[in-house]
Design a protein with these regions (language model features):
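Catalytic cores of alpha/beta
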Residues: 5-12, 53-67, 71, 76-80, ...
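Short, well-ordered coil/turn segments that N-cap beta-strands
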Residues: 15-16, 42-46, 66-67, 119-124, ...
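Alpha-helix-loop-beta-strand connector modules within alpha/beta enzyme cores
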Residues: 29-63, 85-92, 97, 116-119, ...
């Protein structure tokens, strides 16, 4: 939602991070830049979800200070490798290097310091949004430079055929898969954050529209 005050309110409320959706949400590059600047001023981390294959937007978000990227529709190890090439500095990737950005503290850090900080703090999350991606989760998460996964349940449900397992079964399968055990698990929670964490999630995301609509409905007499 392209409203800078919302980002500021989330920071003041004490949330750990905000995920800015540039795939389905209406935020453009200018709004994203404002979100990142406000979050940085409050010391709150920002993750950005670009559109499918929008690696340049993701790179610009990282240059502007985003701490991570949640990349949609990562279907295979090859997709994951392309993602890492775009988002990681050499030698792990091929991202263009600049230190005069917000992420480089406007040229006040050394090149080596900026590279080390980017490598240490940049979180790369692959969204698994089809039965094929769920089946290949182990190979996707084995790619060096991919830190974790978020199952996109809406697209997963829309893309499955009648012969595929249910969304609940696919979710259970990827969470039980031993090849995903070392990856950061991100969950889109529709309810209690504590319940998602207790179930094994390390990062929990809430949909702002859902949160606001629930609050608005609760106001009705």
């Amino acid at each position: 939602m392209p409203c800078e005050e919302v980002v500021e309110m989330l920071a003041v409320a004490g949330l750990d991070f905000v995920l800015v959706d540039c795939e389905h949400g209406p935020a453009d590059v200018l709004a994203l830049r404002h979100h990142l600047a406000l979050a940085d001023a409050h010391g709150m981390a920002v993750l950005v979800r670009p559109g499918e294959g929008e690696h340049v937007l993701a790179q610009r978000a990282l240059d502007q200070g985003a701490q991570g990227v949640v990349a949609p529709h990562v279907e295979s190890a090859a997709d994951a490798e392309a993602l890492v090439r775009a988002l990681r500095y050499p030698p792990r990737g091929a991202r263009g290097f600049a230190t005069y950005s917000r992420a480089g503290r406007f040229g006040t850090v050394t090149a080596d310091g900026h590279r080390a900080a980017a490598d240490d703090r940049t979180l790369v999350i692959a969204m698994l949004e089809s039965p094929a991606a769920i089946r290949d989760a182990g190979a996707i998460l084995a790619v060096d430079g991919v830190d974790g996964y978020l199952v996109g349940v809406a697209d997963l449900g829309a893309s499955r055929s009648p012969d595929d397992p249910s969304v609940a079964d696919l979710l259970a399968a990827v969470r039980a898969d031993p090849t995903t055990a070392g990856a950061v698990r991100c969950d889109l929670a529709l309810g209690d954050t504590a319940a998602a964490l207790a179930d094994g999630a390390q990062v929990v995301v809430h949909n702002l529209t859902h949160v606001m609509m629930q609050a608005f409905r609760a106001l009705r007499a």
